[in-house]
Amino acid sequence: MESLTLQPIARVEGTVNLPGSKSVSNRALLLAALARGTTVLTNLLDSDDVRHMLNALSALGVQYTLSADRTRCEVTGNGGPLRSAAALELFLGNAGTAMRPLAAALCLGSNDIVLTGEPRMKERPIGHLVDALRQGGAQIDCLEQENYPPLRLRGGFQGGNVEVDGSVSSQFLTALLMTAPLAPQDTVIVIKGDLVSKPYIDITLHLMKTFGVEVDNQSYQRFVVRGKQQYQSPGDYLVEGDASSASYFLAAGAIKGGTVKVTGIGRNSVQGDIRFADVLEKMGATVTWGDDFIACTHGELKAVDMDMNHIPDAAMTIATAALFAQGTTTLRNIYNWRVKETDRLFAMATELRKVGAEVEEGEDYIRITPPAKLKYAEIGTYNDHRMAMCFSLVALSDTPVTILDPKCTAKTFPDYFEQLARISTLA
């Protein structure tokens, strides 16, 4: 297996221009495809997940042109639901941001489409979404195991009253919201259980509004969406930088700055993961906010005990930053780590122990006490981009660290390690 050894880093200082947000890129691509008119997306993320969405749209007959660096995409809108005359199978890798929204959108009208992906995708639950779509009239078969992909979709979604469980993934609600305006009837979505990752719903609602559709959001418990609507292209849309990707650089600044500045997001960002910077500030770092940047400067870091449900992806970065904080850090209400690219609670606990931390892994929490001195280790990444990026922070000590399968960062950030090296001074 390929590996990358990072030598100890004495200091980080500099500016990182963030790649486009994965969450925003894939939502914007799908809405542009469904909309009337041509949409030019700029700062689109070039990564595996976005390529899977683009390939799927292409197979569904959507016309688009991509710039050579794949960050500018001109999409000719379909002006309504995506249809395929022939039966079709779409391979979506391990891209949840493609699988979930497409599973809903392709239930409009009458298609015969199979959505499949990598082995890990077949282990990621989608039953709550399938159940909700069936309530709205959709014909869906789970081809291997009930409640998991691959799915066979044969259209039929009408709208109406739909209940969806919000406790596992907000992407199920996102998928329903984006599909509902194109249904023949109005849709009323009622949330069962606690809604996780609420800020990701705000991204969805923001993008729908950008494409001309308003949703009646009743305290995140009930959403009313009028049917028989049409998305309208906004013309040009700039994809903001990826706030989850920003977390590694901001944490590096907190641990070994200097000052590290990330551009492409700022105080008015639509992504909830910018709140990650507040956690670093609470730990003792100095954070500065601009309209299109966030900067973080080193401080003496202290442990925190926090509910991280609102920033599950960025919260992983706090787990490795905790290695540099005084005291025991507890991250709570993170059950949905278990249904991501890998079981992230198990993976994080396992790898933190390798570098010497004392770790308590609960069903929905993790508690981390750093060692007096970090130990050298080879870090398994579980084909999970965030594991690789989180554990790069171990090098901000006097101990090197080896990252196995470093190229797994291609899911969201292909040149992550080059960007980290650019702002680093080795010990």
UniProtKB/Swiss-Prot annotation:
One of its GO terms (molecular function) is 3-phosphoshikimate 1-carboxyvinyltransferase activity. Pfam families: EPSP_synthase (PF00275). Its main location: cytoplasm. The active site is at 313 (proton acceptor). The keyword Cytoplasm applies. SUPFAM superfamilies: EPT/RTPC-like. Belongs to the EPSP synthase family. This is 3-phosphoshikimate 1-carboxyvinyltransferase. It comes from Klebsiella pneumoniae subsp. pneumoniae (strain ATCC 700721 / MGH 78578). The gene is aroA.
